[in-house]
Every structure is written in C-alpha cells, then in structure tokens.
C-alpha cells in the first residue's frame, strides 16, 4: 500500500512554531532596521492584509511597480529572501521535539485510520480487508523551509 503525506506550513504551526506570515512580518517590521530603500518602502506600503503568505505574495506583485529597475528589484528580492531564511533558521533552531512527540508522530504515520470519522474508518477498513498488502510504502512531500519533519523522524536534513 502506498501512502502519501503532503505537509505545509500548518504542520510547523501545529508544532507551535512561529512560521506564519504574521510572524515574519512582525520580525521584518520590529527587528530589521538596516535595510535597502526598497525594503523600507515595502514595509511601509504593505501594512494591511498581513495574515497569509498569499497576502505577501499579492503585496509583492503590486509592489513591483515601485521600481522600473530590474537590478534593484532583484537585489530587493534577494534581500527579502535572506531575511526570510534568517528568520526561519532562528525559528527552526528553537524547535526540539520531545521523545513523546517523536513516538506519537511515527505511530500516527503508520496508523492513519485512528483519525478518520466513523464512516471513513469503515470504508478504510473495508478497503484494507479486501486487499492483501504486504507492506506500507510511506512518502512525504514537505512544502516547508524548515527541517521540522526531519527532526521529528530523526533524519538528516540533507536527504
């Protein structure tokens, strides 16, 4: 049987990590003082709709008209990316999963049915009983920029 898990930012947030856009925006506005003129303009211009990462993406889309200079915009983009990487690195370093969390997570990975509702659990069990699976192959796609999953599973972040 093949099982695929797709993990996004909600996974990190469920681990109590401050990896949402509001957290990064607060970091940008409170902590980043030595900045380019363009980043300063962006921080001043994007003050509303700071709840979702898509809000930042939309704001950046609108903000591209702030310069007609591609080189200046590239520099701004890499500056913003560097701040994001530094922020996520600090958040990532704070995360140290307990043995209890590691064990629970590994158990959850292999016994998905315990989180299903009654009807879905019934269908799942009927499906499993109809087929004879000799093994479970579990794949994970993570869309996060942290190594939260690797820490929980005890894996090298460089795989």
Regions picked out by a protein language model, each given a short descriptive name:
Residues 3, 15, 19, 23-159:
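Active-site periphery "cap/insert" segments of enzyme catalytic domains
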């Amino acid at each position: 049987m093949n099982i695929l898990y797709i993990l996004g930012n909600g996974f990190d947030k469920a681990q109590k990590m401050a990896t949402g856009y509001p957290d990064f925006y607060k970091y940008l506005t409170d902590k980043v003082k030595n900045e380019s003129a363009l980043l300063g303009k962006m921080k001043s211009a994007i003050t509303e709709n700071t709840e979702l990462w898509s809000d930042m993406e939309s704001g950046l889309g609108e903000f591209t008209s702030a310069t007609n200079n591609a080189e200046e915009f590239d520099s701004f983009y890499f500056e913003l990316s560097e701040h994001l990487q530094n922020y996520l690195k600090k958040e990532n370093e704070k995360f140290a999963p307990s043995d209890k969390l590691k064990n629970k997570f590994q158990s959850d990975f292999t016994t998905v049915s315990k989180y299903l509702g009654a009807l879905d659990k019934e269908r799942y069990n009927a499906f499993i009983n109809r087929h004879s699976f000799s093994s479970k192959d579990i794949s994970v796609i993570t869309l996060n920029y942290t190594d939260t999953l690797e820490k929980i599973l005890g894996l090298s972040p460089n795989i």
